[in-house]
């Protein structure tokens, strides 16, 4: 289709990227009478995003303009390329089918439905996100990415954020989304973030793998893998909810693998693994609850820290800790380290139907396993 009459090369949809100072969540400083909690939890993956079905064009919700590969198209007229690799309805719906090109950006709401194999990549030294929804003059940003088939694939690469929304962001469907950022976040939402469906999400960032300033929900039967470099694997500015029975793997080189400001809730048969090479594995200023799910946490000196306490209910939790240099450093229930190679036994009182046990003597990083068959409130392990 011919979209040149709808082309406009000025305005914020065509502006170059912004230099992104890494938005980092600070590591929580322990307060009160106890310090970081040591814990390991085997967990399953919940992955793939929530994006809701594509909505019909609506003036109230439509994008004000989009930019595809450096060319701006204004709302009201459909646009696309002759090969059919991308098509925009002039409102809020865009389809990708074999797209291999540059930046896709919108002001306002944008629903992206991808089919087949698609690649979005920024040019060298471009300081903006590869796929981005930002606030417009009158419309708030919202980005929804979805697929229809398990063979669908979306690959996004950038020096800055790979996928970003200055509002809410959702990923859903059975397809695969791979994001790579060399200097920033793999996926970032300034609002809430949701991943739903049965697909796979792989997010790798030079700072965070996956980050939201609001609530993060992973309600998926698929797989979500998040890898952070200088930042967290998964970071939530509010609550982090993992459910749906899938697998979630979070890794970080320097920070905690999983961080949430308000609390972490893992349930529904989900399997979660968290591994940090430089800090504790799971960190929250709120509480941690694991219900009918598993958590496996590996960190340095500490496995899990939940400032407002931990609750296990029919959960399996495994924690492994090691001192710098990889030397095993067993931790006692009070949070102090011990030179003994024997993992200390659990000394906390438990409900009759709950079971907490230590693993046998080992010279490898310290490991603990907690198995509960009823709700077990704990302040720390």
PLM features: residue spans?
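Sec-dependent N-terminal signal peptides
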Residues: 20, 35-49
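A composition-driven surface/loop motif
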Residues: 2-30, 52, 61-381
